[in-house]
Curated annotation (Swiss-Prot):
Record site: Transition state stabilizer: 29, 238
Annotated pathway: Amino-acid biosynthesis; L-arginine biosynthesis; N(2)-acetyl-L-ornithine from L-glutamate: step 2/4
Class of this enzyme: transferase
Identification of the protein by name: Acetylglutamate kinase
Residues involved in substrate binding: 64-65, 86, 177
InterPro entries: AceGlu_kinase-like_sf, AcgluKinase_fam, ArgB, Asp/Glu/Uridylate_kinase, Glu/AcGlu_kinase, NAGK-C
Primary residence: cytoplasm
Role noted for this protein: Catalyzes the ATP-dependent phosphorylation of N-acetyl-L-glutamate.
Disulfide bridges in this chain: none
Length: 279
């Protein structure tokens, strides 16, 4: 009997959060180990399906960095990084597009199997993500200038769950690889999302990354700005995206450990939460 009471308590604890976030847009940046481990992948898909089925409006922006690197190596295409961003010449961009579109279709299939009306989109579809070149040294890496959010709003209105590949184009129809964190942030801002959640391979933000006891469970926008210059690599890019989002209409940003099963549900629907809350 005790285990049934515990299950009931879990549902009761979740109820006020389900009510609070009903019909709210939740932007989820999906990447890291949660994409690579089949068991974790299934847990994430279950979480997102549940979010959708209890009345939230999730949107997924996915990465695929390790798969892109593996395919580049397999095809003999040189791949390098600068300041946490992949340098993308035409060959690398073509590989990235191919790999990301393959991942996208698999995610659509997974969610459809869970009863969700999922739809896959590339950022070039309907000029969803309009870009300019980010930096000459990064070649075809784009900075988003405009998100044509009307496309996403109409899909949400029709009960679809959009899954977005972070590939965009410029006014001359050149294809650009976009950092998935940047894409998620830009889309969340354009839609003024209730939440933006990053699934990562760390437990969250640390005051000192070498000290695992320095995990930050909650940080204000001003504190995040102070911490950002002290962080390097991919997490620096992620924290900059968090700050940008909070300054531009996104209410809360979450950095979650995608290696923990059901981390999305634990963060959104429990009192304690998990990971780092920014904002």
């Amino acid at each position: 009997m005790q285990k049934y009471l515990e299950k009931a308590n879990v549902l009761i604890e979740a109820l006020p959060y389900i009510r609070k976030f009903n019909s709210k847009i939740i932007l989820i940046k999906y990447g890291g180990s949660a994409m690579e481990n089949e068991e974790l992948k299934h847990c994430v898909m279950q979480d997102i399906a549940l979010l959708k089925l209890v009345g939230l409006k999730p949107i997924i922006v996915h990465g695929g960095g390790k798969d892109i690197s593996a395919m580049c190596e397999k095809l003999g295409v040189k791949s390098e990084f600068k300041n946490g961003l992949r340098v993308s010449d035409k060959a690398t961009t073509e590989v990235a597009s191919m790999v990301l579109n393959h991942i996208n279709k698999n995610l659509v299939h997974s969610l459809q199997n869970l009863g969700v009306k999922a739809i896959g989109l590339c950022g070039k579809d309907g000029a969803l993500l309009e870009c300019v070149k980010k930096d000459e040294n990064l070649a075809f890496v784009g900075t988003i200038q405009k998100v044509n959010s009307k496309i996403l709003e109409e899909l949400l209105e029709k009960d679809f769950l959009p899954i977005i590949t972070p590939i965009g184009m410029d006014e001359n129809f050149n294809t650009y690889n976009i950092n998935a964190d940047d894409a998620a942030c830009s889309i969340a801002k354009a839609l003024r999302a209730e939440k933006l959640a990053f699934l990562t391979d760390t437990a969250g933000l640390y005051e000192d990354f070498n000290d695992k006891n320095s995990l930050i469970s909650k940080i204000s926008l001003e504190q995040a700005k102070i911490l950002a210059p002290k962080i390097e690599g991919g997490m620096h890019v992620k924290l900059k995206s968090c700050i940008d989002a909070c300054e531009n209409g996104v209410k809360k940003v979450h950095i979650l450990d995608g290696r923990v099963k059901h981390s999305l549900l634990l963060e959104f629907f429990t009192d304690e939460g998990i990971g780092t809350l920014v904002g």
